[in-house]
Design a protein with these regions (language model features):
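GST-like fold's C-terminal all-alpha helical module
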Residues: 142-156, 160-168
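Extended, charge-rich low-complexity interaction segments
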Residues: 120-135, 219-228
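Short, hydrophobic/glycine-enriched beta-strand segments
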Residues: 16-22, 164-165
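Loop-to-helix element that buttresses phosphate recognition and phosphoryl-transfer chemistry
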Residues: 24-76, 80-81, 132-147
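General small-molecule cofactor/ligand-binding pocket signal
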Residues: 18, 92-94, 210
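Acidic, low-complexity terminal tails and accessory targeting/binding regions
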Residues: 3-15, 58, 83, 87, ...
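Active-site metal-binding loops of divalent metal-dependent hydrolases
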Residues: 23, 168, 215
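Phosphate-coordination/substrate-recognition cap region in phosphate-metabolizing enzymes
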Residues: 51-121
Length: 228
């Protein structure tokens, strides 16, 4: 008796997820906590998004689904990325991809938090994943929110590739979850604005990292800045 190997082959259900941090913002430059507050993209941030969109166009890269945080800095980035390929009308806005809510810390620099909210400063900088600023979220709550959202999005796009435009904290949490890096461990990796991060979501096996921090659409001086 011969066995047809094609019948025994397991069909892998996988979603390819491109996850992009928004372009540089005015508050990024000033070191101000953004959270659910918003800040305009700088000229550099706009150019970063425009060049990424042009890169996708030149490589003929299109997506079966496009999702963006509904915060302005992410949505503006998503539109600029998708306009060159004519896919900007496909963008779905969702609050589930927002940055961690920082409550009373939003709009403040680290120094301002240290001066006016010393107890919060101590907890905020300790890395405690359970610390929850007044009016905000803990890291654990944020990770649970984002994992649920990304799992649901991925499950709606079996064997397709999708784009998610979001925030640095959200990109960081997915990497930590994927590589089993504890939330309270000090970050030892960069999250460049508009860097390309690609994850695989497998229906049974979960998340796996494929590409991290690809900034080859940056010019030479910007790449050098990211390395400093």
């Amino acid at each position: 008796m011969t066995i047809d190997k094609s019948e025994t082959r397991v069909r892998i259900i996988m979603t390819l997820v491109y996850i992009i941090r928004h372009g540089e913002t005015e508050w990024n430059l000033k070191g101000i906590h953004q959270g659910h507050n918003d800040s305009e993209l700088t000229q550099k941030g706009k150019e970063q998004a425009d060049r990424l969109g042009q890169r996708f166009k030149e490589s003929n890269l299109k997506f079966n689904g496009i999702y963006s945080s509904d915060l302005g800095r992410a949505l503006d980035t998503a539109k600029r990325i998708c306009q060159p390929t004519g896919q900007d009308e496909l963008i779905i806005k969702t609050p589930s991809l927002r940055e961690r809510a920082l409550g009373v810390l939003e709009g403040l620099t680290y120094q301002e938090i240290k001066d006016t909210l010393p107890r919060d400063y101590e907890q905020h900088t300790s890395g405690d994943p359970n610390y929850k600023p007044v009016g905000g979220e803990s890291w654990i709550e944020t990770q649970d929110r984002v994992k649920e959202a990304l799992n649901e999005i991925a499950e709606n796009h079996h064997n397709e590739q999708i784009l998610c435009v979001t925030h640095g904290g959200i990109v960081s949490m997915l990497l930590r979850f994927c590589l089993n890096i504890p939330l309270n461990e000090k970050r030892k990796f960069a999250i460049p604005n508009t860097g390309i991060n690609i994850f695989e979501h497998r229906h049974e096996a979960g998340w796996r990292l494929r590409t991290w921090g690809d900034i080859s659409h940056f010019n030479e001086s910007e790449i050098l800045d990211e390395m400093l």
